Amino acid sequence: MEGKLFLCPTPIGNLEDITQRVLNTLREVELIAAEDTRNSLNLLRHFSITTPMISYHQHNERERTEELIGRLKDGLQLALITDAG
């Protein structure tokens, strides 16, 4: 069974502006791919989300894309978040 990729927008300013649906998704997926893990870690800690996270940005996009597509084909549930928005 193929996995699913969830595109999860994050708040630009106030962390409390995130939707409950996004919070649920971030808790339920197996892995979070984040543009900047330092910024994203603040969000995850604020909401006590312990899902594993990896970096995914313009400098590692080629390598990570192949890796993530392979993991999605293996059934991984993955959320992709950016720094803000």
Locations of the language-model features?
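Glycine-rich, flexible N-terminal cofactor/catalytic loop recognition
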Residues: M1-H59
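CheY-like receiver
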Residues: T25, E67-R71
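Alpha-helix C-cap/termination motif
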Residues: H46, R71-D74
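Glycine-rich, highly charged phosphate/nucleotide-binding loops
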Residues: N60-L68
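Short glycine-cluster motifs
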Residues: K73-G85
